[in-house]
UniProtKB/Swiss-Prot annotation:
Residues 167-195 are annotated as: Disordered. Residues 177-191 have a biased composition (Basic and acidic residues). Belongs to the UPF0502 family. InterPro entries: DUF480 (IPR007432), WH-like_DNA-bd_sf (IPR036388), WH_DNA-bd_sf (IPR036390). It comes from Shewanella woodyi (strain ATCC 51908 / MS32). Pfam families: DUF480. Gene3D superfamilies: Winged helix-like DNA-binding domain superfamily/Winged helix DNA-binding domain. This is UPF0502 protein Swoo_2055. PANTHER family: UPF0502 PROTEIN YCEH.
Amino acid sequence: MNLSLHEARIIGCLLEKEVTTPDQYPLSLNSLTLACNQKSSRDPVMSMTESETQSAIDSLMKKRLVTDQTGFGSRVTKYKHRFCNTEFSDLQFSPAQFALICLLLLRGPQTPGELKSRSGRLHQFADLNEVENALLALAQREPSLVHQLPKEPGRRDSRFEELISDQVKGESVPISEHSRSQREAPSKRQDEMDELTLRVSQLELEVKTLKEALQDLLD
């Protein structure tokens, strides 16, 4: 799809506000610019001017991804997306997929855990499995809409990145390597720690019992 950085931010904001503030959607140029420049829930944080926002909107309208409307009795033009889940959209997403695409457009590459923790206002994921299944479905589309990045040093989990914007993308690795291996590894380590803790407790109890028995003999 090759959206520019500004275009991707605008689409992400329109997706977000459609769900989180439906009473204020569609958005005026001013409201959309403010949404693009939010300090929270944005990475990177931007400082787009209204002129830059309008230029990106115009480009998106030519791509038929955004449409404008003027309410009855109002001179203010407002904008809404046609990016997905409309009768004019090629892309149709489940609520889970919608939330993930929105978050990836607004906040860049993220781990499944980060996506789950940040998605509350968009979609309530039951668990990490639901996140991973939705990511896999998006990756298996033709063309793919997300991909998995190699695990970074110091990180327990791999991050996922959208493939909708034209920003430089990281190296991709097969998603099949992700879910089970990375979720089971911590679980295995936790099981080992629990077993070790139990053994230490048992040894402490045995030592205490031996000390008491020895003390009885000495007495």
